[in-house]
Structure formats: structure tokens, C-alpha cells
């Protein structure tokens, strides 16, 4: 059974207690899970604290509503709609992070609120990429580039000793240049969150998949946020959290973290960089 199946919130698999099984047993009983699920959830709770709730794996009740509306809009629906605030606020009553109980000794996870749902989409891909990179390093791999759906992890430098060159997606998908910047990475990771991924429109307004935990709506202050970090899991979590923060708050958080940089693309296409970001670009060398 692959790691992705363990983190699945939509499907059950025989003999595997995944995130869906945890959700199905919310308010009923603890679920015995594999160590990697406990590790992921423990990491997620740490990132919740670090980002002051900017990334929240316990808001599945809200995210599932947006998922359903988005799927309808991207499917055969001729009249795409936006969920009402009443519907969202009702679901938001069931996203208290304190209702997630991890028991390391028993190897279990329990959601105390029967209506709470986990959704690890904001952290699972980056966390999995980091674990894969760690496994490769332990096996003796010294030069590699991994790309898991936009989560890029570099192990060492290229075989010729030069850094890996990685393009940052231009959020304007119709632009002549597909990359808005190119960075040089050695033992670093890159993750981008953007409004150009998984969105639909209603009355000319874009509704993307990054839902702000406070507003319960997509946050449209940026077109994209890119994070550079030595750890792919943290980069993934930060890309969502910083996307959901005011610029000054996100910049303050990034500047407080070691070896971590960020690039914000604003709605008008202008760019804002953290203080050390330029060192990874051609202009900074």
C-alpha cells in the first residue's frame, strides 16, 4: 500500500486505517494507525502552532464543502455556485484543533468531535517528498532532483557540482515565459501555492482551492507564494500558511526561520522577495 493511500480522505482500503477511517470514526472510537500517519499528524500540529493556525489539517469539514462545489463547477454544472457563509460557518464549528488526540503509546488517533474531519492536503505531498529524500540519502544517494506534483526536492548538487536550476511557475499561464524566476538549489526544496491551481469562476471572480482558515473563503491577496526551505514538508505547510497571511505577517514569519525564503506574486504581477531570496537567483550570484 503506497503512502498516498494512507493519507486518502475519500477512499478506504482493505487492511489499512487511513485518514478516511479516522474521519469515519470521529466521535466514536480511537483508530490504530501506522507510525507514518502519527508522524504526519504530529508534524501538522507543530506547523499549526508555528503558523498560528495558517495551515490547519483539522478543517476538513469546511474544505469538503468547497471541494464539492468546485467539483460541481468543474463538471457538468452550467451554474457554478459559491457556498453560503451560513453553510461554511456551521462546518467551521467542527475544526477545533484541540479535538485531535494523538496517542503515541497506543498508536491511535481520535477525533473528539463527531463532525470533525481531517484533510492533510496542505502538508502530505511535501512531507512525503521529504521522507522519500531522506530514504534516498540513507541509501547513499548524493545527487538527485525529485518533483512530486510541484514539490521539488534537491539532494546535493548536480553530478557536475553545479546547483540544480528550478523554474518557478508563472501564475499567468498565458504568458510567453512559463517561469517567473529561476533559482539555483543545492540540498533545498521549493514549493509553490497559487490561485492558478484547481479553481473555478462565478460572476468573473476566481475561487481557488486555498481556503483561509479564518475567512473560510479563498484568500486572493496573491497570485502565488513560493517557499524555499531545506525541508519539503515545512515548505509545503508554509506555502499554504503564508498564502493565507497578510504580507507583513508572512514576511515576519519567513524572516524568523533559518534558511527559509519566500517569493510573493501579487495580483498585478509585481513580486516581493524575502531578504535572502535573491541569493538563489542568477542576479544574486
Task: Identify the meaning behind each predicted range.
Residues 4-285:
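Mature catalytic core of soluble alpha/beta enzymes
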Amino acid at each position: 500500500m503506497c503512502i498516498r493511500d494512507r493519507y486518502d480522505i475519500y477512499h478506504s482500503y482493505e487492511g489499512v486505517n487511513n485518514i478516511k477511517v479516522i474521519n469515519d470514526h470521529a466521535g466514536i472510537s480511537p483508530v490504530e494507525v501506522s507510525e507514518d500517519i502519527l508522524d504526519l499528524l504530529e508534524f501538522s500540529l507543530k506547523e499549526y502552532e508555528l503558523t498560528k493556525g495558517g495551515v490547519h489539517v483539522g478543517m476538513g469539514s469546511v474544505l469538503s464543502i468547497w471541494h464539492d462545489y468546485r467539483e460541481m463547477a468543474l463538471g457538468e454544472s452550467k451554474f457554478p455556485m459559491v457556498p453560503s457563509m451560513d453553510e461554511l460557518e456551521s462546518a467551521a464549528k467542527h475544526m477545533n484543533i484541540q479535538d485531535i488526540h494523538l496517542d503515541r503509546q497506543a498508536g491511535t488517533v481520535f477525533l473528539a468531535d463527531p463532525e470533525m474531519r481531517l484533510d492533510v492536503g496542505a502538508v502530505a505531498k511535501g512531507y512525503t517528498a521529504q521522507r522519500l529524500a531522506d530514504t534516498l540519502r540513507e541509501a547513499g544517494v548524493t545527487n538527485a532532483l525529485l518533483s512530486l506534483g510541484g514539490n521539488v526536492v534537491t539532494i546535493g548538487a548536480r553530478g557536475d557540482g553545479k546547483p540544480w536550476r528550478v523554474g518557478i511557475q508563472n501564475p499567468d499561464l498565458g504568458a510567453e515565459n512559463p517561469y517567473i524566476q529561476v533559482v539555483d538549489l543545492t540540498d533545498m526544496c521549493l514549493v509553490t501555492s497559487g490561485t492558478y491551481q484547481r479553481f473555478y469562476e462565478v460572476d468573473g471572480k476566481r475561487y481557488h482551492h486555498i481556503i483561509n482558515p479564518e475567512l473560510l473563503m479563498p484568500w486572493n491577496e496573491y497570485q502565488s507564494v513560493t517557499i524555499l526551505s531545506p525541508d519539503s514538508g515545512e515548505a509545503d505547510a508554509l506555502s499554504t500558511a503564508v498564502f493565507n497571511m497578510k504580507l507583513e505577517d508572512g514576511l515576519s514569519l519567513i524572516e524568523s526561520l533559518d534558511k527559509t525564503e519566500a517569493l510573493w506574486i501579487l495580483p498585478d504581477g509585481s513580486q516581493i522577495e524575502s531578504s535572502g531570496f535573491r541569493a538563489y537567483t542568477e542576479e544574486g550570484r
